């Protein structure tokens, strides 16, 4: 099972990624984790990546693809792997294809932006403990206060509506085109000797268990 998980920020990809990893016994490939591990290990690619990171620059796609290929050679990837948050752009998807990185499925978790804004902007956090609430779905006993300590809850900057909207705008511009990219490739079939992935789209609305069952059904 070699899989790319797509969906907007707040669509619930992280939760479903954990279920998929456990069911199929595959690792989640995070480019952030890979970069940190390569830098820490001092590999040639890691040293090169560190130069860009220290200068505050984006690590080039070619270098990230090099790290991906190294990571996929490790024994835990023998049964497959799950990409979450990569590729983010058409250029990265093209680079993966050119590098011969095989993908069986592209699974999109679809949630309307209005729902994501409500989900994320309604979150409230107790800073000292990390306990989280939601003004609609999981409200505290006393509005605006932690259930245990009674201390005030805050809204993190990341959860503010204007921040959520900006993240969704970036997703719309950069990552959403991948849905068309993989959907079109699935229809065209094999390219450059690389089998086209099957494209699946599921609704991310409902309970966590309902969405999990949809995901598993889509990957049969």
UniProtKB/Swiss-Prot annotation:
AMP binds at residues 31, 36, 57-59, 85-88, 92, 156, 167. Signal peptide: none annotated. This is Adenylate kinase. It comes from Burkholderia cenocepacia (strain HI2424). It holds the Pfam family ADK. ATP binds at residues 10-15, 123, 132-133, 206. It is an enzyme of class 2 (transferase). Pathway: Purine metabolism; AMP biosynthesis via salvage pathway; AMP from ADP: step 1/1. GO terms for biological process: AMP salvage. Catalyzes the reversible transfer of the terminal phosphate group between ATP and AMP. Plays an important role in cellular energy homeostasis and in adenine nucleotide metabolism. CDD domains: ADK (cd01428).
